[in-house]
From Swiss-Prot:
This is Regulator of G-protein signaling 5. Residues 64-180 form the RGS domain. One of its GO terms (cellular component) is cytosol. Keywords: Cytoplasm, Membrane, Signal transduction inhibitor. One of its GO terms (biological process) is G protein-coupled receptor signaling pathway. GO terms for molecular function: GTPase activator activity; GTPase activity. It comes from the Eukaryota. Inhibits signal transduction by increasing the GTPase activity of G protein alpha subunits thereby driving them into their inactive GDP-bound form. Binds to G(i)-alpha and G(o)-alpha, but not to G(s)-alpha. It holds the Pfam family RGS. The keyword Membrane applies. It comes from Homo sapiens. SUPFAM superfamilies: Regulator of G-protein signaling, RGS. SMART domains: RGS (SM00315).
Amino acid sequence: MCKGLAALPHSCLERAKEIKIKLGILLQKPDSVGDLVIPYNEKPEKPAKTQKTSLDEALQWRDSLDKLLQNNYGLASFKSFLKSEFSEENLEFWIACEDYKKIKSPAKMAEKAKQIYEEFIQTEAPKEVNIDHFTKDITMKNLVEPSLSSFDMAQKRIHALMEKDSLPRFVRSEFYQELIK
């Protein structure tokens, strides 16, 4: 073992072991040719049961993530695209925050806040979003007494990340290019 690994926290080493095991499983030779087939769609699924949007609206999405998110077809299209890239956690977090803001009951708000935290914010959460430690700490402090604004800072950071990274990839994708034809 190299000297650098000893300095890593135990949780990092455990995570590295888990990844090594998963990679080992993926690298095993298949027993049959049928095992080689991985059920993966190269193109994202088109959104179902959502009224198609106009060309003008779709063209506006290039410049405005907010316009995309406010349009049901745009949101469904964006979500399908992100799913095809296995990177939908940021959008799912943003949607969960929007749903959270609609809650009126303090008890339900506390329950939903805990659920969002466990699913997206806490370290090694199933759909952990990429936010800095400062934002994570502020969010955790806000959850001591949940309010409608508890996730605002984290949601703004994720919105900025989607605007800077996910939206440009979506706009360059074949899927979006077909939408605007």
